[in-house]
A protein has these predicted regions:
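Long compositionally biased, domain-poor regions of proteins
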Residues: 34, 71, 91-94
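A common structural junction motif
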Residues: 35-40, 85-89, 128-129, 152-159
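Short, conserved charged micro-motifs
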Residues: 24-27, 72-79, 117, 140-146
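Beta-strand elements of well-folded, non-transmembrane domains
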Residues: 17-21, 36, 68-72, 112-114, ...
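Glycine-rich, aromatic-bearing surface loops/beta-hairpins
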Residues: 106-160
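Long, hydrophobic N-terminal alpha-helical segment
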Residues: 1-45
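Short, charge-patterned binding micro-sites
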Residues: 42-72
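Long, charge-patterned amphipathic alpha-helical coiled-coil/hairpin "stalk" segments used as oligomerization
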Residues: 78-125
Length: 160
């Protein structure tokens, strides 16, 4: 199932996370892919940017990044994420909009381990996938963003 929205409120969405030396890169990649609607995953797989850096003790760290610049794909992906949150996480997201929103961007962190298992769960730990949602200019107040999130949660589904 996929979500379809027509509100044109998301201009782009970016995902990033670290793959530490103790983790399998393929598993972390799958965790990131699980945040996308199924019909986008194949294309997203081809557009994962990887950068290798080193930690304080010289251990390799891979940084994975995905940027969706298609407004339609970005909004459908964000709708998928919002709809996949538990009711408690959704309420937490809504209640923390002022802390998460800055200069047109909504910042969300989801649990990397749970994403690997196919669940979307907010997290404030360090082991997260960071999501930056660039919102269109008509979404600048907490109330307008809350209304948008509620509309995504209620968006009708369609067969893929």
């Amino acid at each position: 199932m996929s979500r379809r929205t027509h509100s044109n409120s998301v201009s782009r969405i970016e995902f990033s996370c670290f793959v530490h030396a103790t983790e399998e890169e393929s598993k972390v990649t799958n965790a990131v892919l699980n945040l996308f609607p199924e019909e986008l995953r194949e294309d997203v797989t081809k557009n994962i940017y990887k950068m290798v850096t080193h930690g304080y003790h010289g251990n390799p760290i891979v940084i994975l990044r995905v940027l969706l610049s298609s407004e339609k794909d970005s909004e459908n992906t964000f709708s998928h994420i919002v709809s996949s949150l538990s009711e408690d996480d959704f309420q937490s997201l809504v209640s923390t909009i002022p802390e998460r929103f800055d200069h047109g961007k909504l910042y969300i962190r989801v649990d990397k381990q749970k994403a690997y298992g196919g669940n979307v769960s907010l997290s404030e730990s360090d082991d997260v996938i960071r999501i930056v949602v660039s919102l269109k200019p008509h979404l600048r107040s907490p109330q307008s963003i809350e209304n948008f999130l509620i509309s995504l949660r209620k968006a009708p589904t369609r067969a893929a």
